[in-house]
Amino acid sequence: MKKAKLGKSDLQVFPIGLGTNAVGGHNLYPNLNEETGKELVREAIRNGVTMLDTAYIYGIGRSEELIGEVLREFNREDVVIATKAAHRKQGNDFVFDNSPDFLKKSVDESLKRLNTDYIDLFYIHFPDEHTPKDEAVNALNEMKKAGKIRSIGVSNFSLEQLKEANKDGLVDVLQGEYNLLNREAEKTFFPYTKEHNISFIPYFPLVSGLLAGKYTEDTTFPEGDLRNEQEHFKGERFKENIRKVNKLAPIAEKHNVDIPHIVLAWYLARPEIDILIPGAKRADQLIDNIKTADVTLSQEDISFIDKLFA
């Protein structure tokens, strides 16, 4: 079984993880079935997926609780749990809070919901506007020294915020948006993360299915669908993106897989990226994602895709 090391941490993970926002994330998806979500987590662990990525905001703690229920059925040491916090309830809304007290409290509350003694990777989910980022990370380092967390991550940070957060060299992982249609991170983040041995975990890797070969140039989306608001899905740009994605079909055919496996394998071929955490709602989607780990792209494949989406 392939394993990858996350940044400076001692965490070893299978290169395909599971994003669990559809496990108990009732505030994100309507009509979620909790038993289906729990079965998805079970299937992930049974099939060798070691990393489960969750967050307080996924169902306002419910995702963590459901994962905690499933964890009891397995050896805790076989699973790498990543969770995130930054959302503090204020009236009927949420505000971002990176204050040391709030983050420490969040770690303790996540431990209870997950029904575990330690969290493998704890992220600051979003930056707030006022807390010095090194102070926020130092609070998490106290939790690490206490054995409550094993490694520290930040998510959605700018490069300047990341540098401030990593002032004492304590950040193990950065999670941020990166995909073939938005390669900005290659310029902004990758030189820094590479130099400081910080693992970059991309989210939004298939751009709402656009890079999965699911759509044609004539595909339209219902009124109110979020994809209508995304630049990549608008007008001529959408059609051009579809044409590019279709050019990946021969490579997929050659490797006997589908287009999304080729896209995901291209990310994993980058030295800055150790693991991907595609989401799934059903076990069959998860099993399909796992196939990516068996795809080894040739240098020719990698260069072709690089130029196609330059």
UniProtKB/Swiss-Prot annotation:
Active-site residue numbers: 58 (proton donor)
PROSITE patterns: ALDOKETO_REDUCTASE_2
Keyword flag Phosphoprotein: no
Signals that turn on the gene: Induced by inositol. Repressed by glucose. Is cotranscribed with iolR, the repressor of the iol operon.
Keyword terms: NADP, Oxidoreductase
Record-listed E.C. numbers: 1.1.1.-
UniProt GO molecular function: oxidoreductase activity
CDD domains: AKR_AKR11A1_11D1
Sequence similarity: Belongs to the aldo/keto reductase family. Aldo/keto reductase 11 subfamily.
Designated name of the protein: Aldo-keto reductase IolS
Lineage of producing organism: Bacteria, Bacillati, Bacillota, Bacilli, Bacillales
Gene: iolS
